[in-house]
């Protein structure tokens, strides 16, 4: 008999997962998927295919209707200390400075002031926001607000980041720059990342794997391994390999849209 060790357990495992609502609408049906430690998996698919719902199931924010979700071998509820969730809206408190927004979680946990200050400073440095620590959200650009939101998520030292269209509201150049910064942090911190986007180009640039969901009900239609070298930079987007993978993903994505 082989005993499953902690190292052999997938970081995230969904086994026959379905999500139904009281009005009988089916958001997801029969999702089976494993994600290993350190993977960057991005979800693409039509609106309403359950991409955001899937992240909520993994985080424990919403219960499954059928099947099961395990995070590092635990239920999502028991694994919450491992997870940080980053939403499309930065949701910074307007009456708090950047550093006080970033440190809010530690403050609520009654962390010691010196330790909190040191960790907040470290996170702001990681996302290149040390120079605006004393500013308020209204004084920040959209890109700065999102970097502050990422810093706030990192303060808890997560192993897993769940990111639901975090850069969707930003202009293309800002989004590209933040994608590059995110990958720099990803390579340094060795997180496991689940990312939702509607941009094929963004999905290919960021990911080790792209999962395409079909809708009505939401289900896995295709999985694509992204074979692009690391580190990924602005020059990656100019490569033939990148263009080929974007073309492949775009073709498969078109196939799941219903006429």
Model-derived segments and spans:
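Conserved signature/switch motifs of ABC ATPase nucleotide-binding domains
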Residues: 135-138, 156
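Conserved ABC ATPase "signature" region
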Residues: 103, 107, 114-131, 184
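Conserved ABC transporter NBD signature motif
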Residues: 66-79
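Short coil-to-helix segment of the ABC ATPase nucleotide-binding domain corresponding to the Q-loop/switch region
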Residues: 96-103
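Catalytic Walker B motif of ABC-type/P-loop ATPase nucleotide-binding domains
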Residues: 161-164
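The feature captures the beta-strand-to-loop junction immediately N-terminal to the Walker
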Residues: 44-46
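Helix-to-loop junction immediately C-terminal to a conserved catalytic motif
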Residues: 59
């Amino acid at each position: 008999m082989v005993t499953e060790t902690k190292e052999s357990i997938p970081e995230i495992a969904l086994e026959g997962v379905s999500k139904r609502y009281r009005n009988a609408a089916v958001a997801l049906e029969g999702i089976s998927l494993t994600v290993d430690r350190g993977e960057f998996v991005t979800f693409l698919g039509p609106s309403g295919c359950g991409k955001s719902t899937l992240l909520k199931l993994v985080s424990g924010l919403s219960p499954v209707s059928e099947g099961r979700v395990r995070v590092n071998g635990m239920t999502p509820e028991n694994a919450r200390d491992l997870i940080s969730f980053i939403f499309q809206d930065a949701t910074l408190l307007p009456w708090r400075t950047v550093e006080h927004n970033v440190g809010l979680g530690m403050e609520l946990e009654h962390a010691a002031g010196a330790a909190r200050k040191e960790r907040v400073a470290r996170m702001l440095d990681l996302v290149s926001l040390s120079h605006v620590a004393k500013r308020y959200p209204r004084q920040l650009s959209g890109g700065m607000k999102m970097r502050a939101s990422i810093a706030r998520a990192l303060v808890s030292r997560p192993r897993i980041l769940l990111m639901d269209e975090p850069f969707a509201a930003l202009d293309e150049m800002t989004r590209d720059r933040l994608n590059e910064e995110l990958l720099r942090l990803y390579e340094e911190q060795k997180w496991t990342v689940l990312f939702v986007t509607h941009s094929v180009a963004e999905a290919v640039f960021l990911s080790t794997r792209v999962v395409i969901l079909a809708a009505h009900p939401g289900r896995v239609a295709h999985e694509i391994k992204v074979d692009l070298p690391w580190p990924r930079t602005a020059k990656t987007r100019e490569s033939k390999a990148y263009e080929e993978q974007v073309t492949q993903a775009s073709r498969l994505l078109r196939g799941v849209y219903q006429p």
